[in-house]
Amino acid sequence: MLTTTCRRLSQALQRPHALSAVAQRCLRAPGARSYADQNEKAEQPRTFHPALLQFLVCPLSKKPLRYDASTNELINDELGIAYPIIDGVPNMIPQAARTTRQKEKQEETKQH
């Protein structure tokens, strides 16, 4: 049974495939773009719009966040964490956040 399945699979892979009618229509559609066209537009850096801050809150504390343009991060000063913004999209996953109070914690441990 396995050999029959393998044989059918190898025969199917060796045959030249004709595009379906739907695929042909999609390729000829006026909005269809090549991969090169998409790469040209993707090179432009996307920026974060600070107007989004009124809708975004920290997923851990549910408190508003502060945008830091120099580091391109959303900062929660209360918890001391910063969420990165990648291609204009905030990464609000808590595991992706970095701590901002690391230096303060190191100084406290040295004093004790």
Swiss-Prot record:
Its main location: mitochondrion. GO terms for biological process: protein stabilization. The keyword Cell cycle does not apply. InterPro entries: Trm112-like. The keyword Mitochondrion applies. GO terms for cellular component: endoplasmic reticulum membrane; mitochondrion. Residues 49-95 form the TRM112 domain. It is found in: Mitochondrion. Residues 1-34 form a transit peptide. It holds the Pfam family Trm112p. Keywords: Mitochondrion, Transit peptide. Interacts (via TRM112 domain) with NDUFAF5; the interaction is direct and stabilizes NDUFAF5 protein. Interacts with COQ5; the interaction is direct, stabilizes COQ5 protein and associates PYURF with COQ enzyme complex. Belongs to the PREY family. In mitochondria, S-adenosylmethionine-dependent methyltransferase chaperone that supports both coenzyme Q biosynthesis, by stabilizing its components, such as COQ5, and NADH:ubiquinone oxidoreductase complex (complex I, MT-ND1) assembly, by stabilizing complex I assembly factors, such as NDUFAF5. HAMAP family: UPF0434 (MF_01187). This is Protein preY, mitochondrial. The gene is Pyurf.
